[in-house]
């Protein structure tokens, strides 16, 4: 009889002492938009050796109409050019989104949470899509390096702060 449950009188005190852990669930993920152009095949561009590959990454996050749900998107723009002449070999644009249920994250931490943790969770799928599309397009698979989303977030915050300081103040 010593294993019987209590009537719950001690439960509220225990809950106050325990920190509430954030909840993050991926509800869905999908390709919102994608474009791949094999320019080398269209124009007959010949390139020997490793191409010069440029990858641009943009992140976007917005609240959905459903409570505690957010949509986070990774937008990639990848261009491969020959090192010798700079001729375009291929171009890939990918807009990949995830729908997330997020709970127990303080408001002041939500912005970095959305632009760091959520992209980190869906990035492996983005990497695979890029690899598959470049391979299916007739090139060796392009395996993207891991993206440091913390550094990307900090760069964006610094860029916004610099832009805000550079903007002339409106005096009336």
UniProtKB/Swiss-Prot annotation:
Please provide an example of a Pfam family that matches this protein in its UniProt record.
SecB
Q: Which InterPro entries match?
A: SecB (IPR003708), SecB-like_sf (IPR035958)
Q: What is its main location?
A: cytoplasm
Which compartment or compartments is the protein found in?
Cytoplasm
Report one GO cellular component: cytoplasm
**Which keywords appear in this protein's UniProt record, sorted alphabetically?**
Chaperone, Cytoplasm, Protein transport, Translocation, Transport
This chain's function reads:
One of the proteins required for the normal export of preproteins out of the cell cytoplasm. It is a molecular chaperone that binds to a subset of precursor proteins, maintaining them in a translocation-competent state. It also specifically binds to its receptor SecA.
Q: Which HAMAP family match?
A: SecB
What family, per the record? Belongs to the SecB family.
Q: How does it assemble?
A: Homotetramer, a dimer of dimers. One homotetramer interacts with 1 SecA dimer.
Which named protein is this?
Protein-export protein SecB
Report the source organism: Dinoroseobacter shibae (strain DSM 16493 / NCIMB 14021 / DFL 12)
Gene name, Swiss-Prot/TrEMBL: secB
């Amino acid at each position: 009889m010593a294993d019987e449950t209590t009537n719950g009188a001690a439960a509220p005190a225990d809950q106050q002492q325990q920190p509430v852990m954030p909840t993050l669930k991926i509800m869905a993920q999908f390709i919102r938009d994608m474009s791949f152009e094999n320019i080398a095949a269209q124009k007959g561009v010949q390139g020997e050796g490793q191409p010069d590959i440029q990858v641009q990454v943009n992140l976007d996050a917005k609240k959905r109409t459903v409570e505690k749900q957010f949509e986070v998107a990774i937008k990639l723009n990848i261009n491969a050019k020959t090192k010798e002449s700079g001729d375009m070999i291929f171009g890939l644009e990918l807009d990949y989104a995830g729908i997330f249920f997020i709970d127990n994250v303080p408001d002041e931490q939500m912005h970095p949470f959305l632009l760091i943790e959520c992209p980190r969770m869906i990035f492996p799928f983005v990497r695979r899509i890029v690899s598959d599309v470049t391979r299916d397009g007739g090139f060796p698979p392009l395996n993207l390096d891991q993206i440091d989303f913390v550094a990307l977030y900090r760069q964006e915050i610094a860029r916004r702060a610099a832009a805000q300081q550079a903007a002339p103040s409106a005096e009336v």
